Amino acid sequence: PSPSRRSRSRSRSRSKSPKRSPAKKARKTPKKRRATGGAKKPSTLSMIVAAIQAMKNRKGSSVQAIRKYILANNKGINTSRLGSAMKLAFAKGLKSGVLVRPKTSAGASGATGSFRVGKAPSSPKKKAKKAKSPKKKSSKKSSNKSNN
């Protein structure tokens, strides 16, 4: 038999398979969710801020020093993912104002150069509104003038 020809030993009639049972209805009780494993780890941005504050460097802390501090002081961190997580955290911190670049690394971009903790974004204090005294209802004078 040539390899290009199909084998004809199969039956050409298409017999229907036995009827399937109708689809199972949704469960009445919802599935139980897995319990979360203990306390959540701090965000990468909060770890970066803590590292910069602990180093107390006036001119800002380098990315390498921040990474070294985070790995030394935080257990259970995936070292292979820390670099990309730090890049995202630096971008988020710069955008929100939590982190700023010192003048020495103003031209740097991405996760390079030095970073400092920015000044806390001071929310403008809203002036307390004075309680308005309820206005007296003015009584409408009915005009008794007749229209001529």
UniProtKB/Swiss-Prot annotation:
PROSITE patterns documented for this protein: H15
Domain of life, per lineage: Eukaryota
UniProt xrefs under CDD domains: H15
Tissues/organs with expression: Sperm.
Gene Ontology CC annotations of this record: nucleosome; nucleus
Keyword Oxidoreductase: no
Domain H15: 40-119
Keywords attached to this entry: Chromosome, Developmental protein, Differentiation, DNA condensation, DNA-binding, Nucleosome core, Nucleus, Spermatogenesis
SMART domains, sorted: H15
InterPro entries cross-referenced by the UniProt entry: H1/H5, Histone_H1/H5_H15, WH-like_DNA-bd_sf, WH_DNA-bd_sf
Keyword set includes Nucleus: yes
Main location: nucleus
Region (Disordered): 1-44, 97-148
GO molecular function: DNA binding; structural constituent of chromatin
Subcellular location(s) of the protein: Nucleus; Chromosome
GO biological process, one term: nucleosome assembly
Ranges of Basic residues composition bias in the record: 1-35, 124-148
Family designation: Belongs to the histone H1/H5 family.
Function text: Linker histones are implicated in chromatin remodeling and/or transcriptional regulation during spermiogenesis, the process of spermatid maturation into spermatozoa.
Protein name as catalogued: Sperm-specific protein PHI-2B
Lineage, opening ranks: Eukaryota, Metazoa, Spiralia, Lophotrochozoa, Mollusca
